[in-house]
């Protein structure tokens, strides 16, 4: 299996990542998820987001999550890109993409990777609103989503 992980400040091209995931004739299914900066959270207008990470440890954690997905499903390619730094409302934050021979494996693996990324990868998120800024923790619903895979 081919999996690539990137933690970067730069934006990414969903089209380019899709092309890389879809290469070859074995991939009968390609599933992608793109997370974006919302303009509203907890009743407040969000104007931006600041993301920090633990260099080296974050990439290792993401690779481990990809390996766990590979152990559960027959995947051909996995791509995880997570941005750091300052972003504005509407900007792309994260891409998770997987290819597999079958759609069920591709859908499940993509969801698994995103659920584990939200709860296990060392990222810190500060939300900037029109009134103030605040650090955002993982939500209970994120942990519940990850627990269903255990």
Curated annotation (Swiss-Prot):
One of its GO terms (molecular function) is molybdopterin synthase activity. This is Molybdopterin synthase catalytic subunit. Converts molybdopterin precursor Z into molybdopterin. This requires the incorporation of two sulfur atoms into precursor Z to generate a dithiolene group. The sulfur is provided by MoaD. GO terms for biological process: Mo-molybdopterin cofactor biosynthetic process. Belongs to the MoaE family. InterPro entries: MoaE_sf (IPR036563), Mopterin_biosynth_MoaE (IPR003448). It catalyses: 2 [molybdopterin-synthase sulfur-carrier protein]-C-terminal-Gly-aminoethanethioate + cyclic pyranopterin phosphate + H2O = molybdopterin + 2 [molybdopterin-synthase sulfur-carrier protein]-C-terminal Gly-Gly + 2 H(+). It is an enzyme of class 2 (transferase). Substrate binds at residues 36-38, 102-103, 118, 125-127. Pathway: Cofactor biosynthesis; molybdopterin biosynthesis. Its EC number is 2.8.1.12. Heterotetramer of 2 MoaD subunits and 2 MoaE subunits. Also stable as homodimer. The enzyme changes between these two forms during catalysis. The gene is moaE. GO terms for cellular component: cytosol. Keywords: Molybdenum cofactor biosynthesis, Transferase.
């Amino acid at each position: 299996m081919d999996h690539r992980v990137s933690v970067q400040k730069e934006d990414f091209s969903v089209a380019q990542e899709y092309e890389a995931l879809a290469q070859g004739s074995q991939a009968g299914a390609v599933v992608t998820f793109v997370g974006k900066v919302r303009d509203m959270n907890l009743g407040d207008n969000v104007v931006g987001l600041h993301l920090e990470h633990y260099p080296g440890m974050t990439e290792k954690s993401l690779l481990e999550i990809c390996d766990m997905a590979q152990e559960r499903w027959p995947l051909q390619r996995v791509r995880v890109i997570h941005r750091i730094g300052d972003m504005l409302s509407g900007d792309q934050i994260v891409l998770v993409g997987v290819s597999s021979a079958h759609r069920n494996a591709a859908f499940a693996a993509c969801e698994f990777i995103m659920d584990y990324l939200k709860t296990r990868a060392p990222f810190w998120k500060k939300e900037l609103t029109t009134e103030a800024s605040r650090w955002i923790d993982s939500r209970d619903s994120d942990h519940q989503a990850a627990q269903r895979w255990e």
